[in-house]
Amino acid sequence: MKELSSAQIRQMWLDFWKSKGHCVEPSANLVPVNDPTLLWINSGVATLKKYFDGSVIPENPRITNAQKSIRTNDIENVGKTARHHTMFEMLGNFSIGDYFRDEAIEWGFELLTSPDWFDFPKDKLYMTYYPDDKDSYNRWIACGVEPSHLVPIEDNFWEIGAGPSGPDTEIFFDRGEDFDPENIGLRLLAEDIENDRYIEIWNIVLSQFNADPAVPRSEYKELPNKNIDTGAGLERLAAVMQGAKTNFETDLFMPIIREVEKLSGKTYNPDGDNMSFKVIADHIRALSFAIGDGALPGNEGRGYVLRRLLRRAVMHGRRLGINETFLYKLVPTVGQIMESYYPEVLEKRDFIEKIVKREEETFARTIDAGSGHLDSLLAQLKAEGKDTLEGKDIFKLYDTYGFPVELTEELAEDAGYKIDHEGFKSAMKEQQDRARAAVVKGGSMGMQNETLAGIVEESRFEYDTYSLESSLSVIIADNERTEAVSEGQALLVFAQTPFYAEMGGQVADTGRIKNDKGDTVAEVVDVQKAPNGQPLHTVNVLASLSVGTNYTLEINKERRLAVEKNHTATHLLHAALHNVIGEHATQAGSLNEEEFLRFDFTHFEAVSNEELRHIEQEVNEQIWNALTITTTETDVETAKEMGAMALFGEKYGKVVRVVQIGNYSVELCGGTHLNNSSEIGLFKIVKEEGIGSGTRRIIAVTGRQAFEAYRNQEDALKEIAATVKAPQLKDAAAKVQALSDSLRDLQKENAELKEKAAAAAAGDVFKDVQEAKGVRFIASQVDVADAGALRTFADNWKQKDYSDVLVLVAAIGEKVNVLVASKTKDVHAGNMIKELAPIVAGRGGGKPDMAMAGGSDASKIAELLAAVAETV
């Protein structure tokens, strides 16, 4: 077996499959594009779903890739096992309706065992297969595999909801008896026992059925096109080929671990407790790549995942004695390891470091809050005489504050408390079940549509015309091809068309189809791309249509021009964002409608009003500069030399279309555009908002809609000016400010009067001191305007030694407000209010020194006050 670096393994994989006629698919962005079913790209096949479900036909049905991926369903196991990772690299080879089982197995065996390639020893390889899949068994035998090395496994059948499915065969490497201390042998494979002896290095999925959850597996229908989908983890291959005990001792992780050694002063011991080193090395890889691909830490979705990873890594850094910000210092090492295939980490190093460091600094403050929460929980346990920290509280520390369970356990045990591990596991399982349920709901590969995939007739979109005559090539009605249709809805393909099919954020054209008499025979309501790329017109049929007949196709010209104004303005906006807030502000999505444009982009904070003003001004300057818009068809490399921006997630063919707006903007774009920027007329931003972690959205209008927006603002300003009696519009702001200042002064004066009144009233309330169980207390009903006044009472009470406990009740409107304050450790205000609040049909809680509650039964106030003596 050859000893290869990870870069050599990756390249040899790609070279082998290229020699078998495969094209190399570049690694896609970790953030899925146009796929709401995925939080992250989580496998090599995830980016190829459109090919497997038949919605798009690839130029070459043989594909290979090395795809960066993220999976986060087992974060807590990262660092504990030899093979769990959040970010990993999946090597794959795929056949879309081309070769199948025989070639997949034979070529796979050749790659693994040939001296020209990986040169694995054959006697170290074992294969599992689905028991009913005798063809795979026989093919392995034909390759020279001993029957004793073939293990039937009932679970070797791949399916995730509706869509492509089929048996799979897995390949394992036997690391020998040193990794099998109990000498269990092949039972480890046959009974799926977790072990470090047999390492799964490759899975070959034989996708031959359309899975249907409504029927038994035996009734699944054969796919129109059988497919091959395989995946081999680079990290595992590297561990085996480099003789590493775990994935972490390979050249993918050790350089990071060496840097952590320098930062911590600790030494990594492969045979010792090295979990913290592994967690840090794994998580900084995921963070570096995900942030480089446009995801940013946040409180939801993928942003929450990144925040959780970063906080877990920071806490493990503290366990190694690293108390200052340090993760950002590891980003260059990650970039250097992966540079040969993924140069983007080093290219975006400054931005990634900035985000990681800022998040570390924020978490340093959060740790203090989390420590305070834990201290409060432990104090409450002491007050209640309990000795165990509940699982739900441990989970909250873990989930909300990023505290690893080990740290909570350590701090709690130091304070003399036990840990409710089972309760924590239960809370964790509930979260995982919710996550898995979400995958089941949205993780299907999608059903293949044989009718659409079978359209092979050529069709060409004509950019520079609004109307043309063309022959009708295909009619599909009720999901079947037909020669004619006279009513209902149908899908049509023409030899050529002026109708733009929805793509790249630009909506489809609408319009009409006329016969040779000039009568409208169909209304075009939508246009989408067919699997083979033809514009597929969805029409409402008004009169007879037949294949082979010529028709006149007319688009709605006014609508197209309005859409083009917004699309061209989107290109200007994209360039302006780069200039004003930074080149990291790349497109994350767009929509160019008739009435408005919507542009989503990566950015880590709200765009300030001043920045929005600059962006809006810059776009309008380019409109007024009357820049000529040109389009050029060329190859991708030439386009990039021209400075064209290629968008994440977009797949470009051999010939691409470059849209250039003067010297200001150059982008790869297949959409339609104006001839000159001046045709936009006017550009106005109407909204800027966050739509998720690290993603902002700008909504803007152009032309007539922009003018209407300005006029509406002016009308509103005139109304405000009239209300505040400003002599001119320019004086309105000063008038409003003066009124605001006056209101603030009055509110301040009112608050001071309330405070004086409360202080005066407090003198009477605080005189009535009672005693029970050795505790001095005051219990009184007070007449106040709001709950804030109760806190003012409590603040005044704290200033002097009136009593040990204060209980105040106020009927405010239809609600009863209760406050309990305590100066003594013998009375926990939060616990006391939990006993008192139900008397007035309420509930509440709080800290040991202060608690509040709300109720609804004012008739029981006297009963509550009488109960205070029993509850202190």
From Swiss-Prot:
Keywords: Aminoacyl-tRNA synthetase, ATP-binding, Cytoplasm, Ligase, Metal-binding, Nucleotide-binding, Protein biosynthesis, RNA-binding, tRNA-binding, Zinc
Single Gene Ontology MF annotation: catalytic activity, acting on a protein
Subcellular localization, as worded in the UniProt entry: Cytoplasm
Co-factor remark: Binds 1 zinc ion per subunit.
UniProt xrefs under NCBIfam families: alaS (TIGR00344)
Keyword RNA-binding: yes
SMART domains: tRNA_SAD (SM00863)
A GO biological-process term: alanyl-tRNA aminoacylation
Matches recorded under HAMAP family: Ala_tRNA_synth_B
CDD domains per record: AlaRS_core
Family: Belongs to the class-II aminoacyl-tRNA synthetase family.
UniProt cofactor(s): Zn(2+)
EC number: 6.1.1.7
Species of origin: Streptococcus pyogenes serotype M28 (strain MGAS6180)
PROSITE patterns: AA_TRNA_LIGASE_II_ALA
Protein name in UniProt: Alanine--tRNA ligase
One Gene Ontology cellular component annotation held by this UniProt entry: cytosol
Reaction catalysis annotation: tRNA(Ala) + L-alanine + ATP = L-alanyl-tRNA(Ala) + AMP + diphosphate
Pfam families on file: DHHA1, tRNA-synt_2c, tRNA_SAD
Record's function text: Catalyzes the attachment of alanine to tRNA(Ala) in a two-step reaction: alanine is first activated by ATP to form Ala-AMP and then transferred to the acceptor end of tRNA(Ala). Also edits incorrectly charged Ser-tRNA(Ala) and Gly-tRNA(Ala) via its editing domain.
InterPro entries documented for this protein: aa-tRNA-synth_II/BPL/LPL (IPR045864), Ala-tRNA-lgiase_IIc (IPR002318), Ala-tRNA-ligase_IIc_anticod-bd (IPR018162), Ala-tRNA-synth_IIc_core (IPR018165), Ala-tRNA-synth_IIc_N (IPR018164), Ala-tRNA_ligase (IPR050058), Ala_tRNA_ligase_euk/bac (IPR023033), DHHA1_dom (IPR003156)
Upper classification of the organism: Bacteria, Bacillati, Bacillota, Bacilli, Lactobacillales
Entry comment, domain topic: Consists of three domains; the N-terminal catalytic domain, the editing domain and the C-terminal C-Ala domain. The editing domain removes incorrectly charged amino acids, while the C-Ala domain, along with tRNA(Ala), serves as a bridge to cooperatively bring together the editing and aminoacylation centers thus stimulating deacylation of misacylated tRNAs.
Superkingdom, taxonomy of origin: Bacteria
Binding-site positions, Zn(2+): H567, H571, C669, H673
Predominant location category: cytoplasm
